[in-house]
Each structure stands twice: as structure tokens, then as C-alpha cells.
Amino acid sequence: DINDELGYLTSHDTVVLAPHLLPKFDMTAPKVESLQKLNTLLSSVYTFKAANLALNPIPDSFKTLMIAGPKQDFSDWELLQIDQFLMKGKSLAIFLDSFREIRQDNNAYSSFDQPVFLPLNTGLEKLLDHYGVRVKKSYIMDKSCYVNRGQDGSEMPIYFVPILKEKQINQDFSFTKNISEIVMVKNSPLEIDQEKIGRHKLKATQMLASSDKSWEMAGKINLLPYMIQPPTDEKEFAGRPLAYLVEGEFPSYFTDKPLPEKPQKQEEEKPADETGPTGQVQKPAPAAPDTHIKEEKGIITRGKPGKIFIIGTSDILRDNLLDEEGVSPNAMFLLNILDYLSGKEDIANMRSKNQKFNPIGETKPFTRNLIKTFNIVGLPVLFILLGVFIWARRKAKKKMIQQMFKK
């Protein structure tokens, strides 16, 4: 295969990349949310390979491992596999959800039922915290957001769908300079521990942030749009980090800890799911012996230069935010980030030059209300005045003709 391998974690109840086809007449099968558009876009550049930590170690052939919305706990042994993968100078693309969304049973009275949001802890959080990054247990609400407009002219802001403008997107990278708008959904803010970042000599770069008119929803989460009200205290509004890129020689989380034992069930190699040569997840090649391990403990305690991209949502990967051609800002950002993590920054730069989406400038509420008022009231008044003017002209002309015949 001429394409580089891109690892995708298929264990731990991550978002399904490309589901197996369901039986043709099985109408009772539950609907499986998947990332089919992302799978199609990336399959032209990469060969997706499954990484199942319960079956096999992460192959050395991967340059980048994607972890999208895990919901099951990671054992210490599995965290060790991820930690040591990073120590080898590899990259992690982590799309981490802070809450598990539990939908209510459908019934005749549930049209207004709100899903229950429970805090989600998988163990991956402590690994990230060791590297100096934390994902907060809250959602970002933003006045700069998607607005649902009704046929009657009414507007309903969807605060948990922020629309990031050019000022909130890091423009220091050549592959992000032409991206002027990104849509987010149910994003948790991030925190950087500057003391750890400095002590480990890492570089943390903020890639995305909310607007200055954003706030956090924590505790009891309720995402019914008409129930969400902005805070009255202006001090609660502030821009907050939504995505970070951390680079450098990461220290191992297990340096001063007892090494976890390999589970017995991993002693016997089991085949991973293979979905065929259609750009979907395939079985990885067996891992080669690790020649980098030189420490007495049998692990790498200080890694080669690696990268972590971390964002507090997996919804940005879903089909409703991407296009099939890969020219939308959201698709462009994701493709470019994964290329950068995989050492293909030149491809990301070339792709970014083809960015054609240039949104019109945002109008202020006063301007929008003025235009609405003019359309509703101004235009009818103009028509009335025009009618009066035509009537007056006709009356004057009629009077002039009468005066001519009197002579």
C-alpha cells in the first residue's frame, strides 16, 4: 500500500469509523453513528488500521493514532501502550468527550425529554494531566453561535454550537491561515498546566478558542435551547481554549510507578476485524520488536519529539459537520491537523491554498434589526408614498388639461 497507515482506536467504545453493513431487512437493528465522511476523506491519503488495545499492542508502522470519544475505562496496561507509543516520537489525535450522553426511551410523552449527561472518566485523563493538559467537566456556551431562524422571522440561538471566527483560530500555521470559520458542537474547554509544560520543556500551542462572549455550563447539563440563558454577570464571559497542540519530548507517565502486568488474555494473539480494501478499518500488520527500549525498567522514560492534538469533543468528526469533498473549513482543519501530526505538513499547506470558503462579514444586532424593520415597515411605507406621488402627479396633470380647455 502506497498510503501511510493511520491508526484508529476501535476498542473502548470509541465512535465507529465505518460500521459493518446491517442485514438488508433488519429494521430492528439500532442505528449506529459513524464517521463515514471522515473515513472517505482520509482514505484517499491514508490506510486506516484498527488498533484494539485488548488484542494487540499498537503497531510501530503507525505515525499517528486517533482516539475518538472513548467511553470505556483504560487499564494501566493499555495506558502504558499509549504512553510508550508517544515516547517513540509518534503522534496522538485525541477527541475526548467529558460527558456520557444517555438518551431517554422514546415514548409519546418524551418529545421534550432531555438526555442525561453524566461525567465521563476513562483513565485517559490522568495520562493527559501528567503531560500538562486537562479537559474540564463542562460545556462551552457562546453568543457567537449557530442561530436557528424560523419562517416567521424568529431566531433561536443554539449556544452549544459555537461558530469560531478568524480571531479564535490560530493563524500562525501556514495550513490554518485560510481557515476563517469553524463550527463546534458540545465542546469542553481545556486547561494547560504551565508548570508541568515548563518543567517537561514542552510546547503548548492554543489552536482554537471560544469568543469573548462565551461561558461555561457545568454541573447539571441541560441543552434544550429555550432553557439556556446567558449569565447576567459580565465577569462570567471570557474566551476559553478549545483545542491545543502539545509538542516535545514527553516524559513517561510510568517513570516512577510500578509497571502494570500484561493481561493474560493478550498472551494469545487474536485477529482484528477486517473490513476490506474500501478505505475502512483494516487489520494492522504485526508489531515489530521495539528497538527503542533501552531503560532498565523496560520502558522509555523520556521520549523522542512527539505531538498530541487534544480537543474536548468528538462531535467535530461527525458527518453533519463535514462535507464529502473536504473543502469546508471543518473538514480542511481536521485533514490538515492529521497531516501535520503525521509529518505531512507540505500536503496540509497545499490543501489549505485551495480553501475557497470566505464567509461574509458578521453584522451587528442593531444593523440586523434595522434591516428587518426596514423590510417589514419601510418597504410598505415607500410603496404608499410612491402611490401618493403617482396619484398627485395624475391629479396635477388632469387639472392642467382642464385649464387648457377652459381657455
Roles of regions detected by a PLM:
Residues D1-D4, T10-S11, V15-D346:
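Acidic, S/T/G-rich, low-cysteine, solvent-exposed domains in lumenal/extracellular/periplasmic regions
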Residues D1-T40, N52, K344-K407:
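Hydrophobic targeting/anchoring helices
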